[in-house]
Structures are given as C-alpha cells and as structure tokens.
Amino acid sequence: MESIASSYRPISASLDHYYLRRPRLALALILIGYVVAATLYAVITPDWQNPDEPAHYNNIAYIAAGHGLPVLHAGDYDQEYLNALVSGGFPPHLSIASLRYEAYQPPLYYIAATPAFWLGNGNLLFVRLFNVFLGAVSLLLLYACMETVFPTKPLLTVGATAFVAFLPMHVAMSAAINNDGLAELLMLATMLTLLRWLKRRFYRSVAFSSSRTDSFERRTLLLLGVLLGLSMATKIYGYAAAPLVAGVVLLTVWLAPAAQLDQRLARPTRQNWRRALGAALWVLTPALLLTLPLWLRNLQLYGAWDLLGLQMHDRLVAGQPTTAAWIAQEGFVTYLERTMDFTFRSFWGVFGWLGVFMEPRIYTLLLAFTGVLMLGLLWALVRFICGRPEADMDRYQFWVLGLFGVMVLAVFASFAWYNLKFVQHQGRYLFWGLLPISAFVALAWRELMQPLQGKLTGLMARRTGCSAGGRRPAH
C-alpha cells in the first residue's frame, strides 16, 4: 500500500502547475470561447426556438410597456395552441402574445432585462445577448468560488469553469431568454460570499471575536442574506438554497472549526449555540424581508397560502402530462427508464423545445465519459480516506466538498419533487447546482491525471468496452 501511495505522492504536489502554468490566461480563453459560442447560439437559433422563451419574453414586454408586474390569469396557458406553435416552427401568422404562463415567476429577472428590451426596441436578439452577458459574469463568479476554496489547484478552478462554459445545453440556455441566467449569477454570488466567510472562519485568528471583526462579520452575513433574497426574487429554486445557506452558517458558528485537520473541533457550548442562531438570523432576516412584498402580492392575487403562485400555475397547466397519468399508462419501469435516459440527454444537450437531439453516438460517448468521471471520483474518495498527505486538502476544503455534496443532493431532491406532479425530465433543471457538479467533475478529472489512477482507469475502461462489445480486441 505504501509503495502505491509513494508512486503518485510526489507528482500530486505539483500536478496542477505541471499541466496548467497560467490559469488566468486559460480563464480568459474560456471566456472568449464561451462568448463566441453563446453569441452564435443567440444569433443562429430561430425565434422562439428555446423552451418557454415566448412566455419569458412576454413578461419583459409587459413590464416594458408600463403595465407593472405580470399577473397570471386563467387562459394564459393553452396546450393545444402551444403544440401548434411548436410543431409549426412558430409561423409568423400565429401570435405568441397569449403565451403568458410564466407570469407567476418572481419578477427580478424581467425587471433587469427591461433596459435591454428598450435598447433593442423589443428585438429578440438584444435580450438574448443580455443573457449571454449574465452567463459570462456567472463564469467569473464560478471561477472565483473555486479559486477561493482551491487557490493552489488550478486544474480544479479552470476545469470546473471550462465544464460549465462549454456544456452544450448550458450554453444554449445561456443564449436564450429565461430567468435562469440571473438566478445562476445570484446563486453563485451568494455561494462566493458564503465560501469567503467560511474561509475566514476556518482560518480565523485568535482575535476573531473583537468588536471590529464582529462588525465585519455581521456586514458579510447581511450581504449574504441580501443576495439570497435577490435569488429568491428571481427563481423559485432560491428558496431551496435558503435553508442550506442558513444551516451552513449556523453549523459553522456553533462548531467553530479550524482549517488544520490535526486540530479537534471545539466542544459546542450554549454560548456558541446562541451566536449560531444570531448569525443565521442575520442571513435569513434580510432574505425574508426582500421576498415578503412578493408573498403579500401573491396572496392577494392568487388566494390564501399561495405564496409563490404555484397553486395557480398548477391549475392552469392542466394539459401538461402528469406523472401519475404517465405511470398508469406506461408503467413504472418505463417511467424510470425514460426519466434516466431523457434527463441524461437533456442535461448534455437536447435543443429547441426538447425535440432536437444530437447524434446517438455522441450520447454514447458522453455516457462513457460520465462513467470515467465516476471512476475518477472513486479514486478521489480513496485518496480522502487515506488522509493527508495523500488527500492534499485541509478541513476547510473538506467541509466545502461536503457542502457541495449536500447541494447536489438538494438539487436532485428538488428535481424529483417537481417531477412528482408533472413529467419534466429536463436536465437543465439541475443547472442551479452547476457549481458543485462542476467541482466534482474537475476533481474527478484531476484525479485521473495522476499517473497510476489514469493507467488503472484506462485499463478498466478498455476491459469494460471489450466486454460490452462481446469480444476481445485482436492481438
């Protein structure tokens, strides 16, 4: 075991800088590549040939015309008419004005996109390019998040950024009109603030409890709450992040961890618990105050307890296929197969209104690539179990990876919850978790660049491929 560990331990210390000497240059090239690719998507994609794009556009047009915030009404969703538009390629003689079924969405994105609408006099491309800009800012924030946690591991920072920048479906959605772009940006800004606060907590000095430091911490937590509230005012999945962020703050203040693995966690005390509750309230209070007006408005418009307008939305979209009806007609096994297959494909790329697929062999290659990444994560897990120096990480980085793991679980849980009602096996609904997902992708790929792990993974992949093909390669 010692001989195996020693075979890769020396190179692991300089692995990142061996392969990537100028990470900022790589980041610049990634940004340029993303902007070019996303702009081409925005220009070439025919009008309205993105999921729900007309309904999002109509929300912006409604605000730009001076009518105030959109309101969801009966008749704003007509499944037959929508099917006719999609199947006909949105012919010019059929109006999109009646597609207003996204009016229940939180309004911040539509308000932010209104100047782009005015600047282009309602031109679709101008608003699409606004989303391309949001995507570029999001990439910078994602890189900053990764660099905050792994400042000496550019393979992780650059790798995660590159994965998100060139994920085909994500590029397509970043070049379309929707509220996902601003929601991702605000989510990443929230995470960057949280990760920097966590880092300061883990590497705190003895004088951490001074009044000056406490004042700085309160301002940081207040900013965290404001960003979280803005995220909740942009996309409903911001609500899923609220308990996660507040829980991390509470747990960190309560346990008072240090970065060094050889330092024990402090024994939780009642005083620490009171401080932890206070810190969590500094986050939740501004977030809730920012969203309170939206709740009151929704209660007035849509009825008691419909804080988010979801009940009104569910009543209107009666024509959408429901999960219960699908299972009753096709069977549960078929439903699971469809869930896994279509979610996988649409995560990587199913374009238009989810009807334009890539070549089948591309999905096969992506499936093989995903399998290789799983092996890379397995190698990383073995390294973490071995502990330092093989792990090459401190407690702060381990905690962040744990947080990322919980975030991935939350993303898939919200995806499963939404699919309990309607059949919505769209991989793009996982994109609000691209920070942790891309971090694990980069971690797996970095592990595979270790000589021993790479050779063993290649051997396993070849044997698996031979078994799948039913024959051994000829000598």
Model-predicted regions and their roles:
Residues 22-54, 61-90, 97, 282-300, ...:
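Transmembrane signal-anchor helices characteristic of membrane glycosylation enzymes that use polyprenol
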Residues 299-387:
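Membrane-lumen/periplasm interface segments of multi-pass, membrane-embedded glycan/lipid transferases
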Residues 220-236, 286:
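Membrane-interface alpha helices of multi-pass inner-membrane proteins
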Residues 61-127, 313-329, 336-337, 341, ...:
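Interfacial juxtamembrane loops and adjacent helix segments
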Residues 30, 226-227, 245-246, 265-295, ...:
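Hydrophobic alpha-helical membrane-interfacial segments at the cytosolic entry of transmembrane helices
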Residues 126-151, 189, 379:
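Transmembrane-helix motifs of polytopic, lipid-linked glycan transferases
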Residues 125, 142-166, 184-185, 203-206, ...:
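Transmembrane-helix signature of polytopic, membrane-embedded enzymes
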Residues 193-207, 214, 241-285, 295:
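Perimembrane helix-loop-helix junctions
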